[in-house]
A protein has these predicted regions:
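Acidic/histidine-enriched alpha-helical segments
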Residues: 59, 115-139, 227-233, 333-358
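Short amphipathic beta-strand starts and helix->beta connectors
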Residues: 66-71, 174-186, 237, 291-298, ...
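Compact, aliphatic and Gly/Pro-tolerant "microcore" segments centered on a short helix or tight beta-hairpin
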Residues: 124-189
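His/Glu-rich zincin catalytic helix
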Residues: 1-66, 171-174, 184-287, 324, ...
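Short, low-order "capping/linker" segments at domain edges
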Residues: 137-141, 238-250, 352-362
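Short, polar/flexible loop-turn hinges at active-site or ligand-entry regions and domain interfaces
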Residues: 48-51, 93-96, 115-124
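Short, flexible, solvent-exposed loop/turn segments with mixed acidic/basic and small polar residues
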Residues: 75-76, 84, 183-191, 299-303, ...
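M16 family metallopeptidases and their MPP-like homologs
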Residues: 18-30, 36-38, 55-111, 148-170, ...
């Protein structure tokens, strides 16, 4: 439902949970220059505001609302970057008063958005500096993790788009360059220029919600967003080797595929990836790790919104070429149809089970609705989605596998 140009509210009625959930999402274009600013905004939104200017008073106010929880997160989809504020609170039936919490919770959200902890067009320095340091520490700790580091470096190598080279929370050097002024100005831009989607998950009075949201100064905005990205195939594989002090080496491979969300072969791609390396029954795991002992860990994953499929393997440095040949061999076997019907059927069962389990999470419902709004008929109901998975044949999997092509190879070489 449109509130203004570029501003929408989405009702997701459900009695599945004891809580109601409000998700306020701001989505802008993915840009290397703004990722760190937006990550800092998400930190500040979950820390304090003018009405509750300390971390302690902020938490106490949430506690007074019968333990209402506030969290923020950032995410990317194609060439877009989103910042979410999520408020979760008890439904009226569980509150020992007749008034309920809706108005107070939405009022608190409004304070976070329109009364941020600021002075003279910038965030209050003391709290901002703490949150900036917290984010930098978080990023530094992540970078010390060899698997995370290899993933980041693998994507830097694979992508040509500068925004996609940067993790969704930014990089420490990008965060370091931001100030209380630059982050605050970005926040003001987000409020007035980003696409805004407000998700109401649970039991809500639609009229009451619309009445409340019209009190927010949400003006119309025009924004052109690209939720899908497709990188052209090149016939030269980019390679990089980087030594790092570690007892283990990591092989990070980037493959390109030509499919987008909702395409006919999207479902075959899901099945292929699950069979190739996503789960513990996959050919990479059972063959390279369990049977041949070439990898401590190995897995694959793909992002339908950027056209990237990744394989990582934690290995001994001396096993690099052997592991590379093993991964290529297993991919070729799938291309040639050298896998059993029982493996295909087992894969479908696991995908089905995981999809049904994910329905228990409110965020899954939010993403399903968002995809429906963005992609229209390409986004299917769970029932239809499962039907499409079930229709995938061996021939479909082989066809998709033949379109998965290696584009980058990053090797984190462990040295003592």
């Amino acid at each position: 439902m449109k509130i203004a140009d570029g501003v929408y509210v989405h009702f997701i009625p459900t009695q599945k949970y004891k809580t109601n959930r409000i998700v306020f999402r701001m989505t802008g274009s993915l840009n290397k220059q703004t990722i760190a600013k937006r990550a800092l905004v998400s930190q500040m939104l979950a820390t304090a505001n003018q009405m509750y200017p300390t971390v302690q008073s902020f938490k106490e106010r949430l506690a007074s609302l019968y333990g209402t929880q506030l969290s923020t997160r950032v995410s990317t989809k194609g060439l877009t970057h989103s910042v979410d504020i999520e408020l979760t609170y008890l439904k009226d039936a569980l509150i020992p008063t007749n008034e309920g919490l809706f108005w107070e919770v939405l009022g608190f959200l409004k304070e976070c958005l329109y009364k941020p902890l600021s002075r003279v067009a910038q965030y209050q320095n003391k709290v901002f500096d703490i949150e900036k340091q917290n984010l930098m520490t978080y990023l530094d700790v992540d970078t010390e993790n060899n698997y995370y580091y290899s993933e980041v470096k693998g994507r830097e190598l694979y992508f040509v788009n500068e925004g996609l080279k940067v993790p969704k929370y930014g990089q420490a050097e990008l965060v370091e360059a931001e100030t209380s002024f630059t982050a605050y100005q970005e926040f003001q831009s987000m409020l007035t220029r980003d696409r805004i989607d407000i998700f109401m998950v649970g039991e809500f009075d639609d009229y009451q919600v619309l009445q409340a949201l019209h009190r927010f100064p949400l003006e119309g905005r025009q924004i052109d967003l690209q939720f899908s990205y497709s990188q052209p195939y090149v016939n030269v594989v980019k390679e990089k080797i980087e030594p790092r002090q570690s007892s283990q080496s990591i092989l990070q491979l980037g493959y390109q595929f030509p499919y987008q969300y909702g395409d006919k072969d999207y479902f075959a791609l899901i099945v292929f990836n699950a069979m190739f390396g996503e789960f513990a029954h996959s050919v990479l795991f059972t063959t390279l790790r369990e049977k041949e002992g070439l990898a401590y860990s190995i897995s694959s994953q793909f992002d339908i919104f950027t056209g990237l499929l990744e394989v990582y393997a934690g290995i001994e440095k001396s096993n690099r070429n052997q592991a590379m040949r093993g991964i290529s061999r297993e991919l070729n076997y799938i291309k040639l149809g050298r896998f059993s019907s029982s493996l295909l059927n087992q894969t479908k069962k696991i995908i089905r089970m995981n999809a049904l389990l994910s329905e228990d999470h409110a965020l899954t419902l939010v993403e399903q609705r968002f995809n429906k709004v963005i992609f229209g008929d390409k986004s299917l109901s769970l029932e239809n989605w499962l039907d499409e998975i079930e229709k995938v044949t061996k021939k479909d999997v082989c066809r998709v596998a033949r379109q998965v092509k290696l584009q980058s190879l990053f090797f984190l070489e462990g040295v003592s």
